[in-house]
Structures are given as structure tokens and as C-alpha cells.
Amino acid sequence: MEEKGEISPSGVVTVKGDEALVPRTEFQQNPSFLQFVSPTTVVTPLPPPPAPSSAPVPTTVTPGSATASTGSDPTKKKRGRPRKYAPDGSLNPRFLRPTLSPTPISSSIPLSGDYQWKRGKAQQQHQPLEFVKKSHKFEYGSPAPTPPLPGLSCYVGANFTTHQFTVNGGEDVTMKVMPYSQQGSRAICILSATGSISNVTLGQPTNAGGTLTYEGRFEILSLSGSFMPTENGGTKGRAGGMSISLAGPNGNIFGGGLAGMLIAAGPVQVVMGSFIVMHQAEQNQKKKPRVMEAFAPPQPQAPPQLQQQQPPTFTITTVNSTSPSVNTVEEQKPQAYGGGIVRPMAQMPSSFQNDNSTMNNFTPAYHGYGNMNTGTTHKEEHEDEDGGDDDDDSGDTRSQSHSG
């Protein structure tokens, strides 16, 4: 069925066919809006979404028109990025990620023993004690020494150091080892030796204490020994020795404790170690207890402002209830050049320097720097002068009387 739409001169759009059922739109109510629309184009806006109903809604498309009629075509291709969520709020199937169903561990990897991949709190509570891992704590400093086992004098091996040296042919192996044992207070032990020997002196394991000397070329099978430091009554020494096993040219094996020289027939390589005996290490670690001197806590002092505000205190001893106390500096001493006595010098307290009433009653002592009877001498001189004048006057009177 062919459908056409026409525009009348009055601006009313005429729709034929099924479009007559569609209600009038804004374009029909406002004819002036259609002046911008091409006369050959019919624009039909989408109506509001109809109420859901069981009957399907027919959709028609007008050929030659730019927009479809009511309803949406799900097969129509749209431009732009597709929406992640559908209008109903569900996730777009394109954005769904395939979920993998993991295979249970029990079916993929068989467990053996008490080992498990996951360790939850509930599982840790039921685990035996031997499977619980404990955190390791690193303690700085030397650990506390443990007492030796019964039958052992002390533990050895503290600060163990290895040494290696080579003895040339014609040299004594024993003389090369002894200097190491004499250095410091370290103990040494011979671990191994390889080479050949030309001369060796061994001790006899008898009560006579004889020695046997072997000359030739012998291979060293083993060389061992130790030298431990000892101290007896303040005298330090060494205790120990070495033993050796040798093989002769015909395959004979002999050996024993060294009782003399051990001359090398060729290069002999010796490996030994030095260490500190445990009881010596303990003695070195013991330190004198630190003596802390006890000091009396300082007494709190008043601030300088309070010290200035406190009134000064004085101790006054009255003499004759009127004069203040006099502090003598030194006792009476005769003057070095004669002529009197040096009287003690009086010092007046500072509190009485501005007291007029006290000063009136206080008679300072004079410092004697000569004859203390100077006042009397001056009086006698004045009296002599006055007497001389009297004599002169009397002489004049007599002369006048004689002249008269």
C-alpha cells in the first residue's frame, strides 16, 4: 500500500493510510514551524513510549522520509560507541567477560603430608606444634656461655681461624708450627699435612722414654696435634704435642709421637687452625662493674627576682646597750719603728652607715702611725709657747720698771 503525505496551502499536513491514526503533533499545531522544512519531506517525530501491552505495536516506515515512525528497530545499526548498560539497567552482553571456573586444588594437585596451600586462622589453630614456624630473632653480642657437658673441661671453637703454610725441603716442620702456638693466648691444632719426610724422630711408648730416628724418604699419611695455653702460678706455658704416621718405600707403615726433628724432603703443605678457649673468652668478656658516683641533688635556687626582693639579714651584738659590735681585724701590735702602739681598726657594719643616731654614739678608733700621745705633746708645746710669751712679757715689764 502506497502512502503519501501532502501539505495544503494553509499549512496542514495530510496523511493517508495508517498515518491517519497517529495523533496530531507539534508540527500540525504550529504551521509556522514548517516554513523551514522542505515541502517534499515529511517529518514525523517519535511519540512517547506506549504503555506495555500484550499486543505487538505495528511499525511502519514511510519511504522517502528521514525518520522512522513509532517503535525502535533493534536491527538498525547505530553509530558511535555502544552503551555499556541497556535502558533497563542490565549490562550489555558485549561487555560481559567470560568467567573461568577454576579447577579445585584438591583435584589438580594432590596434597602430601600436612602441607596445604592456604593457611587460615582456623587451620593454624589445629596445626601441630612442629609445623608452626617461629620468627627468628637475631641477638647482638655474644650469647651466654653454656656449661660444658660432663667429662669436658671447656668448649672450644670460639673465633676459629685457619692457617696454611708450606715448608720447603730441608726445613723442620716442627719449628714452623711452634711460632704459631707462641703468638698470643690462642690455641692451635694441626688438621692435615701432605708431602715427604727425610728425617723423623719418634718417641718410644715405653717407660724408658727412648727415641727412634728414621732416615730415608717417607710419605706423610697423617699429621695431627694440638697446643693449648696453660697458666700455673702466674707462669704461662703450652701443653700438647704432635703425632705422625708415615709410609716407607716398601709399604711399611709406622708412626708415633714426635720427639725431635721432622725434616722435610720436599715441599710439605700444612693446614692448621687457631682458636680461643672458651674459658679465656669468658674472662676477656668480663668487665669491671662500672662504679657510679652518687652526687647530692642540687638544691633549687630561688629566681634572681625573688633573691633581690628578700630583705638582708644582720646579726648585731650590742656593747653597753648603745654602741654596735666592732669587728677587730688584728690584735694590738707594737709599731715597727717605735713610738706608740697600733690600735685595732674598727669596721662598721653597712647597716649602720646611714644611721645618724648610732653614728653619734659610735666613737671610731684612731689608727696609730706614730706616738699616740701626740695630743699631749701638742698641748705641752702650746703651753711652752704660752709660757715663753709670759716670760717675755714679764721680762718686758721688768725692763720697763727698771727703766722707769
UniProtKB/Swiss-Prot annotation:
Entry keyword annotation includes Transmembrane helix: no
Primary residence: nucleus
Chain location of the short sequence motif Bipartite nuclear localization signal per the record: 76-84
Superkingdom of the organism of origin: Eukaryota
Keyword Secreted: no
Stored CDD domains: DUF296
PANTHER family: AT-HOOK MOTIF NUCLEAR-LOCALIZED PROTEIN 6, AT-HOOK MOTIF NUCLEAR-LOCALIZED PROTEIN 9
The name this protein goes by in its record: AT-hook motif nuclear-localized protein 6
Record organism: Arabidopsis thaliana (Mouse-ear cress)
Gene from which the chain derives: AHL6
